[in-house]
From Swiss-Prot:
Family per record: Belongs to the universal ribosomal protein uL29 family.
Domain of life assignment: Eukaryota
Pfam annotation, one family: Ribosomal_L29
Protein's cellular compartments: Cytoplasm
MF annotations from Gene Ontology: mRNA binding; structural constituent of ribosome
Protein's UniProt name: Large ribosomal subunit protein uL29
Upper taxonomic lineage: Eukaryota, Metazoa, Chordata, Craniata, Vertebrata
Function noted in UniProt: Component of the large ribosomal subunit. The ribosome is a large ribonucleoprotein complex responsible for the synthesis of proteins in the cell.
Subunit structure: Component of the large ribosomal subunit.
PANTHER family reported in the protein's UniProt record: 60S RIBOSOMAL PROTEIN L35, LARGE RIBOSOMAL SUBUNIT PROTEIN UL29-RELATED
Keywords on record: Cytoplasm, Ribonucleoprotein, Ribosomal protein
GO terms under biological process: maturation of LSU-rRNA from tricistronic rRNA transcript (SSU-rRNA, 5.8S rRNA, LSU-rRNA); translation
Organism: Hippocampus comes
Signal peptide span: none
Amino acid sequence: MAKIKARDLRGKKKEELLKQLDDLKNELSQLRVAKVTGGAASKLSKIRVVRKSIARVLTVITQTQKENLRKFYKGKKYKPLDLRPKKTRALRRRLNKHEESLRTKKQQRKDLLYSIRKFAVKA
């Protein structure tokens, strides 16, 4: 089998991808048997190509699954941890804009009574 391109895989359905994955795994096992029995050099170099193709198929499968999950959870209140944005622990625990802007009654009164003084400088 020739090298598989990821862009060709993206248009396929999951069943087709799984079938292709199974074919690639069978081919890899045959190549490994040929390696043990002393196969041709062309078969030995093909092992690497098949392994990388398997990785591409698996990558496309996981990416499409994750994309579908993102669509499903869009607009919902809670999302799975792996779909949430990966930030530092401190950033995840930080107050949001609304919570930061909240003021106590005492602070509101203080701001009202003692507003910031503006001075004009005479040139």
